[in-house]
Amino acid sequence: MRDRILPFAVSFAATCLFFINVCDWIFDCGCRSLWAGADAMCNVHLANVHHCPICSRGIAGYTAVMAAVSAPQLAASVWLPFDKVTRIVLCLLLFPIGMIAVGGLLGLYDGYWGFVGERVGPR
């Protein structure tokens, strides 16, 4: 069983470390690495601007996004019939793919990029 969980453990560690970096890459919101200020410069702390769709949802939102991004990694780690190294690579690739999918949906829902029309989500 340890062999099945190891790819998830590696990808989950990478997800936890670089989650906020990918948030900034998607939304250009001002978030920085955990060791360089994290969300201290995120636009969620500024008035009268579009707020980062991930950071604006608080701890519950972070938890939901992390669960949505990590669930496919866990499934791939446990159920795919490939060798351990291949599953590690696939699980690591699922991190940015999951963040783009979840972040994209939240950004569209919130009207973050402004090309969908009126904001329909929470401000």
Regions found by a protein language model. Give the residues of each.
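Membrane-water interface at transmembrane helix exits
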Residues: C23, Q73-S77, G103-D110
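Membrane-helix interface and helix-disruption motif detector
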Residues: P53-G58, V85, Y112-R119
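Juxtamembrane boundary at the C-terminal end of a transmembrane helix
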Residues: G103-R123
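Cytoplasmic juxtamembrane regions at transmembrane-helix boundaries
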Residues: M1-I5, A67-I97
